[in-house]
């Protein structure tokens, strides 16, 4: 059980909807599993944090997958989450790292690239899917998710994401916020929000200082205005299994399975999301072949 969690809140009498997350241990779990280097850890961690909060907006068994592909050296960042605070992620090239940028920060933009898109696919149940995409406008990811909400979901939002990495590659702090303007919000409220966000300390610094998700929202929106609705735990969770990969092998067809038996005397599958390995004996593959006959 991690100490990570997300809070859902309203502010300014329901004119603003807000989410904030602490994801340090969740991102650490992903870093450990994928051996990511610092710049890759920051890019993956920011994406995981955003995806976890987007998952918190879902209901029941709904889930979503986010693919960030800016055509940069890191390749794709793929994360998925559900409404229960479970999130997982991987990157194509985990050993991606660059010198710090001019601001002295991890150069996430250089790793992610700026010539691609963010794609979001929501599985809302009953074989019903919603998908949206928007171009990457910054590569720093916070601005890119902000732009995604404005263009794909027509929801004016501000997304702040931060990950700090220790010299030994472990995660020092990770978290973020999504603040959304609801239909009918007063201009005065929007102006206050814009001013507060433009003047705030970077989110990773606030988390490093020990600010909780509640504290983050109080810092941005003002303690008097925030009404916390719910607090839910967040953790790295992968739903892969021996059986799921066996089904995937089944989908490869008879010829491919016969080849595995003849040449490899079995099979091994590795989960992209968590790195777990699953081994399949000749005997298991023969049983699988018989079921296809």
Swiss-Prot record:
Subcellular location: Cytoplasm
Principal place of residence: cytoplasm
An individual GO BP term: protein refolding
SUPFAM superfamilies linked: Hsp33 domain, HSP33 redox switch-like
GO cellular component: cytoplasm
Gene Ontology MF terms: protein folding chaperone; unfolded protein binding
Keyword annotations from UniProtKB, A to Z: Chaperone, Cytoplasm, Disulfide bond, Redox-active center, Stress response, Zinc
Disulphide bonds in the chain: 238-240, 271-274
The keyword Chaperone is assigned to this record: yes
Modification comment: Under oxidizing conditions two disulfide bonds are formed involving the reactive cysteines. Under reducing conditions zinc is bound to the reactive cysteines and the protein is inactive.
Family annotation (Gene3D superfamilies): Hsp33 domain (3.55.30.10), HSP33 redox switch-like (3.90.1280.10)
Function: Redox regulated molecular chaperone. Protects both thermally unfolding and oxidatively damaged proteins from irreversible aggregation. Plays an important role in the bacterial defense system toward oxidative stress.
NCBIfam families: PRK00114.1
Family according to the record: Belongs to the HSP33 family.
Name under which the protein is recorded: 33 kDa chaperonin
Gene field: hslO
């Amino acid at each position: 059980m991690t100490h990570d969690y997300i809070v859902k809140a309203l502010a300014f009498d329901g004119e603003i909807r807000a989410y904030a997350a602490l994801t340090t241990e969740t991102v650490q779990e992903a870093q450990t599993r994928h051996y990511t280097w610092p710049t890759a850890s920051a890019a993956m961690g920011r994406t995981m944090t955003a995806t976890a909060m987007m998952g918190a907006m879902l209901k029941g068994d709904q889930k979503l997958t986010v693919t960030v592909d800016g055509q940069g050296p890191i390749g794709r960042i793929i994360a998925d989450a559900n409404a229960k605070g479970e999130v997982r992620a991987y990157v194509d090239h985990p050993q991606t790292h660059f010198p710090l940028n001019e601001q002295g920060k991890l150069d996430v933009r250089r790793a992610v690239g700026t010539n691609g898109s963010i794609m979001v696919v929501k599985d809302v149940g009953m074989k019903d899917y919603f998908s949206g995409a928007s171009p990457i406008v910054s590569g720093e990811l916070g601005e890119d998710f902000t732009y995604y909400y404005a263009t794909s979901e027509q929801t004016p939002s501000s997304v702040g994401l931060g990950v700090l990495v220790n010299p030994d590659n472990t995660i020092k702090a990770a978290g973020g916020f999504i603040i959304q303007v609801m239909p009918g919000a007063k201009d005065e409220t929007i102006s206050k929000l814009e001013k507060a966000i433009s003047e705030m300390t970077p989110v990773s610094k606030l988390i490093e200082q020990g600010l909780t998700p509640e504290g983050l929202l109080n810092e941005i929106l003002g303690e008097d205005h925030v009404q916390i609705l719910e607090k839910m735990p967040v953790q790295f969770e992968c739903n892969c299994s021996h059986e799921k990969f066996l089904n995937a092998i089944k989908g490869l067809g008879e010829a491919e399975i016969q080849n595995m038996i003849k040449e490899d005397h079995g099979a091994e599958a590795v989960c992209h999301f968590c790195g777990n390995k699953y081994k399949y004996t000749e005997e298991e593959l023969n049983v699988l072949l018989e079921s296809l006959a």
